[in-house]
Design a protein with these regions (language model features):
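Conserved segment of winged-helix/HTH DNA-binding domains
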Residues: 70, 115-137
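Alpha-helical residues within the helix-turn-helix
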Residues: 81, 92, 98-99
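Histidine-centered divalent metal-coordination motifs
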Residues: 61, 92-93
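Divalent metal-coordination and catalytic microenvironments
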Residues: 57, 90, 97
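N-terminal leader segment of winged-helix/HTH proteins
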Residues: 1-56
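N-terminal helix-turn-helix DNA-binding core of bacterial DNA-binding proteins
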Residues: 39-86, 112-119
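Short, hydrophobic-biased segments on the C-terminal half of alpha helices
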Residues: 65, 94-95
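Beta-hairpin "wing" of winged helix-turn-helix
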Residues: 98-108, 115
């Protein structure tokens, strides 16, 4: 005997149909979802956020971004010295970050200075560092 598929109702909330297929309990809490309707992250937005955190997931890039978040701008040699990285490895990471719009480069003669120009990213990096310090402590 074939198992009969139970069809869940489609709820109407503020003119939007919500398919409850797969819900174990067909129960909605309008008071809980009313404040967030239309405010949740879009699919495109979630891709952007995931890409941002993907860039930050690399420890070398996180250290570079944190250093640039706590200063105005630094030349490649200074960043390499502070972080204990080779200029070659650092240049590779800086190019990666610049191509994705995380840092900007200013050339003065043969010197290249990098800076973090996005205040949202600066706050995110600084908050992440503060959180890491609390977790480690």
């Amino acid at each position: 005997m074939a198992k009969r598929k139970v069809r869940r109702p489609v709820a109407q909330i503020y003119g939007s149909a919500i398919n409850l297929e797969g819900c174990e309990v067909a129960c909605l809490h309008p008071e809980a979802i009313r404040p967030v309707l239309g405010r949740s992250l879009s699919r495109d937005g979630s891709v952007t956020v995931a890409a941002l955190f993907g860039v930050l997931a690399d420890p070398s890039r996180a250290r570079i971004l944190h250093l640039l978040a706590i200063t105005d701008d630094l030349c490649v040699c200074d960043i390499a010295l502070v972080l204990g990285m080779s200029v070659s490895a650092l240049s590779h990471q800086l190019r990666f970050l610049r191509e994705r719009g995380f840092v900007t480069r200013r050339k003065v003669g043969r010197m290249a200075y990098y800076r973090l120009d996005d205040d949202h990213l600066r706050r995110l990096v600084l908050d992440g560092a503060a959180h890491a310090a609390e977790v480690v402590a």
